[in-house]
Structures are given as C-alpha cells and as structure tokens.
C-alpha cells in the first residue's frame, strides 16, 4: 500500500532551509519509503517529537502515520533535530 506524504508547515520550513542536493536526496528517499514506511522507520522513544523517524545520511525525518498518510513533522540534521525549541 502506498502512503501519501503530507508535510506540516514546520517541515516545509525545515526543507526550504536545506541545500538543493540535500532536498533532492531526502525527497527521493521519502518517495521510496512511502511504499513501506514501517520497514525503514524506527520508533522514537520520546513521542513528543513524533512517533517515527527515517535516517537519510546525516539527516532525520520525524513523522507520524495517520491512516494512509505519512505526516512529516520535522526534517533536519541529526545534531539539531532532537533539540527542543
């Protein structure tokens, strides 16, 4: 079952800040992951950020699954993504 990718405003802002080659790499990975998201995802221990994460090199995508949608909550470098703001 293919899942639909939905981006929160925060995730859209996070992506906008990235360099174009990083955006491309993350976009391609998300399309690939949308086929079977739980196969590639890890459950987060702190559900305040979100339920799951994808690892894409040094970048992390924090997301929830709602029905047949992958709701992308945050996108960022691993050194920054888990910091609370």
Q: Where do the model's predicted regions map?
A:
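Enriched for short, Lys/Arg-rich terminal
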Residues: 2-13, 17-24, 56-59, 64-85
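A short, surface-exposed loop/turn module that caps and links secondary-structure elements
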Residues: 30-54
């Amino acid at each position: 079952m293919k899942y639909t990718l939905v981006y929160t405003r925060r995730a859209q802002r996070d992506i906008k800040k990235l360099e174009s080659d990083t955006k491309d790499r993350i976009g391609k990975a998300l399309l690939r992951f949308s086929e079977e998201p739980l196969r590639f995802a890890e459950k987060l221990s702190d559900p305040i950020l979100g339920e799951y994460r994808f690892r894409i090199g040094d970048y992390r995508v924090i997301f929830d699954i709602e029905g047949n949608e992958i709701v992308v909550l945050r996108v960022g470098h691993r050194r920054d993504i888990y910091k609370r703001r």
